[in-house]
């Protein structure tokens, strides 16, 4: 779609479910936020990042409602955030869990289901990958024996996987911040990268459909401005969104 004002090709619209926050600088009350590095990476890739209010009153929202609200989006980015309530995957609540919000969880899960079902290009990061896994029937390790917080490490990638194709290297440096990890992999998904200690770092669809999808456990936005390999993840999402738009 071209801009009616300039005639230039309009940026693909990338929907990003906002994160609920108890406070934010310059705001007096509770807020909805998106990580600045995340939206800047999307914008640098040529996309137009748009925050979406994660409305799910009482922790309930229908997939049909999410489909209606996100119909405008050319692509979707599920970002990091707090812990997913284990009620969604049949687990008892561990004492280490934090920042849980049933409204946020319900909305994100519905977004994941809709994106995959509708074939809408989807990049899922950290919590976002965990949400996709749970949405597809998978489970999580609620508190890893060894947390990956403020950690940068080397990750080996397997040729032939989508994540290898996008990043373009056999080994990349990743920035991690998480204390949870994937346990049982959801239906229709498979792991395509793992850390040296066995943590699932990337998942893809077992049988890719019409829409582009990739999920990673690390935070590519942390280093995207200085690492072209990490920025290519956002470029791949925006490119797929542009192709979907036609």
Predicted regions and their residues:
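Active-site-proximal beta-strand elements of phosphoester/diester hydrolases
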Residues: 214-218
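Conserved G/P- and acidic residue-centered "switch" motifs that form tight phosphate/ATP-binding loops
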Residues: 126
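N-terminal beta1-alpha1 cap of cysteine-dependent amidohydrolase-like domains
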Residues: 1-123, 134-136, 141, 145-167, ...
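The feature captures the ABC ATPase H-loop/switch
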Residues: 129
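Short, solvent-exposed loop/turn elements at beta->coil junctions and helix N-caps
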Residues: 177-181
